[in-house]
Amino acid sequence: MSSLSNASHLMEDVQGIRKAQRADGTATVMAIGTAHPPHIFPQDTYADFYFRATNSEHKVELKKKFDRICKKTMIGKRYFNYDEEFLKKYPNITSFDEPSLNDRQDICVPGVPALGAEAAVKAIAEWGRPKSEITHLVFCTSCGVDMPSADFQCAKLLGLRTNVNKYCVYMQGCYAGGTVMRYAKDLAENNRGARVLVVCAELTIIGLRGPNESHLDNAIGNSLFGDGAAALIVGSDPIIGVEKPMFEIVCAKQTVIPNSEDVIHLHMREAGLMFYMSKDSPETISNNVEACLVDVFKSVGMTPPEDWNSLFWIPHPGGRAILDQVEAKLKLRPEKFRATRTVLWDCGNMVSACVLYILDEMRRKSADEGLETYGEGLEWGVLLGFGPGMTVETILLHSLPLM
């Protein structure tokens, strides 16, 4: 055989291998699980708890301001992995800027994978197949950076097989719920038979601190963020009668908004994670979101809808002002953000886990109301993540009929 024909034969072999390795269908969400830590704090009394727990009750005017901030958030309650008795052991954490990173790490490093594993157990149970069939694990968090990392610890807690392909997404912030869905799509579609366990877990104690008159950004963060974890099972070519496909991940794209790096940024210091947010963040997001939407539709050869109300919506609830301005910019009816506002009210902003919670809320409500699809009876929708950078994750979803 000549060298030319031999090379051609090898190329055919490579192409055949490549084709055999890839799935036939689109990546699909097949199961969802969520988990909370045990301590529930009503938002209308959170200022009392926060100023008492941080030994700041003498800051009367600042407390009044913080209470007003809390009551404007449209949050009803939040969950945390700490209570007042727990925080008494850590006066360095409840101060504003005392060195406390070691203690925060000691709490988060075991706590994050443990909470994530709780959500994963629920997702695996709903999926209905043995955990030994999980081929990939994508774990996401913005706290508890360590080695071996949180993906390793979560896999160990779950008893996943030792050759699971693991990925850890650290320190991406609020847009990362979209990031992990983008990763899951690529993994599921490029590995035939893959079943990807996606886990997002967040603990706010990495950035909890006492109030300071000169740093209201952190006060705003303390009024918004809550603890939580969520998990998905994602795979292509679902097994009929065994797996329950809900949402197809048709397209996933990331966009960085130019000249917006200083709008939202966080920095890890000896005193924990410091939070900075410009008052321009709602306007920055709302002015750029439509371009991201148009891009994701055009990238798959679809014409963007003339009326954005024809879609179902899963935007990350960065805060009330962000939702209000995006809703106004896109001329959306108030009910379009119902699932997002429900999760914001029930749980606060849980960073990367939020959009997965909203996906769960939407599919459950759709089933309860007897609608035709998991996406509020609609066929097409979008999931949006917003976070530091400013970075936007735009996910085009196709909702399947309710089973």
Swiss-Prot record:
Q: What is its EC number?
A: 2.3.1.-
pH-activity relationship: Optimum pH is 7.5.
Assembly notes: Homodimer.
Record: residues binding CoA: S281, G318, G319, R320, A321
The name this protein carries in UniProt is Octaketide synthase 1
In this record, what's one Pfam family? Chal_sti_synt_N
Gene3D superfamilies the record matches: 3.40.47.10
Q: State the superkingdom.
A: Eukaryota
**Organism this protein belongs to:** Aloe arborescens (Kidachi aloe)
Residues under site feature: Determines the polyketide chain length and product specificity: G207
Q: Kindly report, in one word, the top-level EC class recorded for this enzyme.
A: transferase
* Annotated catalytic residues: C174
- Family, similarity comment: Belongs to the thiolase-like superfamily. Chalcone/stilbene synthases family.
